Amino acid sequence: MDVVLYIAAAAILLVLIVFSVKIRGRTQDADVEDHQNVTARVSARPQAAPERAAGMPRRRRGLHSRVNAQRAQRASDNEDSPVEADEDEEGRNASEERPQAAGKVGAKKQRKLEEKQARKAQREAEQEEREERKRLQELRDQERQKEEEKERQQEQKQEEELQRVKEEQERREEEEYQRLKESFIIEDQGEAEELTEHESQSLLQEFIQYVQKSKVVLLEDLASQFGLRTQDAIARLQDLIADGSLTGVIDDRGKFIFITPEELNAVAQFIKQRGRVSISELAQASNTLINLTPDIHSSA
């Protein structure tokens, strides 16, 4: 399509050049003819006669000559004017044809250029949109990775802390158990008697069984049962809780409540299922989940 346009433009340009040369030749011929006519008129014009006082007839002949010359000049001009008018008309037509042809070619190219620019702008907009979506996705991925890394570090930290606490508790329980086993003392009438290892172990088991069967025991009664001071009984309970021999709590009324591991698991499962619970709800659930009825009522 572009080759056809180029050939058409070259043909139009060639016609314009030939037309311009033709007009120029006609103009030069007309100039030569005008020059010859003027020269002929000048040479044919009579010379002015010397003024005379009574020379009226001679002046009238000169006047007639000038009038005739002017008439001949006008006739010559009228003969030349149709040719010049035709040439001017042809020049105007050629000039009008050139902008029209050039305008058609230019409008088509302009339309193609605008369509090309529109497609390019659309592609750029789509590319920018894809890049924006990709950037947002990368940001979301980075945020998710940060959250996952933060959670992983927190879990690792909690596991390390639990492991440290567990190891520390096991070490302390072992130390307390050895100390309790080796130095279990019964105070009788203000005198301390050190027991053998077998007796100490037997008395320790009796102490544990008494608490487990009683379920709820006053600390003063527990101390009196084994001939201990109340503070010593509390210390023994704390040591046994620390090494895992007993599980339970000491309330603010001076009682120890024994809770089995199964009951503790039941309470933990209740809290896990309910999520957030109040103290009153937990106390109400504990009455059904924890058995507080003693197995025996005896004193040593």
UniProtKB/Swiss-Prot annotation:
GO molecular function: ubiquitin-like protein ligase binding; UFM1-modified protein reader activity
Membrane topology label: Single-pass membrane protein
Acidic residues: bias regions: 78-90
Quaternary structure, from the entry: Component of the UFM1 ribosome E3 ligase (UREL) complex, composed of ufl1, ddrgk1 and cdk5rap3.
Keywords: Endoplasmic reticulum, Membrane, Transmembrane, Transmembrane helix, Ubl conjugation pathway
Residue ranges, Cytoplasmic side: 24-300
Phenotype caused by lack of the gene: Morpholino knockdown alters craniofacial cartilage development.
Name of the molecule in the record: DDRGK domain-containing protein 1
Organism for this UniProt entry: Danio rerio
UniProt xrefs under Gene3D superfamilies: Winged helix-like DNA-binding domain superfamily/Winged helix DNA-binding domain (1.10.10.10)
